[in-house]
Structures are given as C-alpha cells and as structure tokens.
C-alpha cells in the first residue's frame, strides 16, 4: 500500500529557504579581550514554528542566550582578584561597581538585528557600565582603600598619585564601588567638606582640616586596644566624621579630588 509522506519536497524546499533567510547574519559581541559570535549554527537553535507551520525566530530562546551572556560577563558584585599596594593578591567581592547587561533591551536588539540581517560587531545594551571592559574591569586607574591599614592610595595608569592615612568607622563597607559624583561645600556632620567624593548611597570620601590621625590612633589604642576603627560614639572633640565615610587630611583630599573622575573604581577591603 502507499503511505503519504509527512513532508513533501516543496515543504522541505520552503523550510530550507526560510532557514537560510533567517540565519544569514553574523553578529560578534565585543567584550574587549573576549568575543562571542552569533552565527548560522547558533541561530538555527533559535528557530521555531508559528501557527501556520512557518519557521520563525523564537524570542524566548534569544532571551535565554542573552541571559547566558549576562551570567558570563556581568561583573557587579562578583569576586575579583586584586593586587594590593603592598603586593598581596586578595579576593574582593560585593559592592555596586561593574558591568550589567540590560537583558530585556538586549534581547529585543539582538532579535531585531537578526531579522534585519545586520552583520555587525556590537556591544550589548548595558544597564550599567564600568571603567574597563577587559577581564580586569577595574583597570589601572582606581582608588584603593585598606580598612585594616587605614590607608588610601590613588593610582592613575598604574602609578600611585596620592598615598595617605585615613580615618574610618566600623561600618565603612568593603567591596568595589565607583566615584558617583564630585561636589564641593557638602555638609557632613558638624562641618562643611570642601571636597566630597560619593561612592555609594550617602557615603563619601572627604577631607577634614582638623583631622589628626595620630591623635585618633592614640584614642583608639587607649580606649579599644588593637581595634582598627574609629568609634564615632566616643567623645572625640577633634573628630567630625560621619559613620561609614572615609576621611582624609584636607591636603590629601584636595589632591585626590583634583585627580579622580566620576566612574573611577573604588576598591575597599579589610
């Protein structure tokens, strides 16, 4: 007996033509020292059928791919290997600094680029950008803060430009942040800071003309033994700090202010 075929040759031909049409594009994602390629082989996996049986791009499959890119290349809050000013390799995690792909917008953009057959080299749509797109997204210009050593070092292109002692509190957060804004004449506690560099929420780096690091260290050692932090609840008449902030001698703060830019990474560790 004769059995009718499930697919006829003209249907196969139509499928082949549609597949060639939908996959005739190459899109290369540029992540600086890394690349990802979307080509015919990959796009074939994103094809589905509509109610009429015609081949179409499956947007959900594209969204899944963009999610994989984000999992691989987003860096906000991730663990980073960092070389400290005293040549130690440590792991720094947390904070708000880093790259973040806007997944819904990038899904739409990639979907449309494939439909439009726009062969291109592109970067994803980002919800947040950072200073460097390399694997080392901190780069070589950054502010380094050691909470344990109470020390701040500003590097520009790998060269230390500012190196100073600091005053902190036990609530000063660690992690990787960025300079969010530069302002002058900001009210901080019972003083006005001439140089204010915010790095997260209401916290910032600023200078205090009356800051005496030696006096603060003596007070700490007398009151709290070997603690590494300033206790802002103690009665310190020469202290005007704000909980969680990083305070510098005024001269160092002025120099820091002149040399940093918004968006510059701030690496804080214990």
Tell me the role of every PLM-derived stretch:
Residues 1-191, 195, 210-212, 260-262, ...:
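Surface-exposed, secretory/extracytoplasmic low-complexity segments enriched in Ser/Thr/Asn/Gly/Pro
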Residues 63-64, 172, 186-270:
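Exported/periplasmic cell-wall-interacting domains
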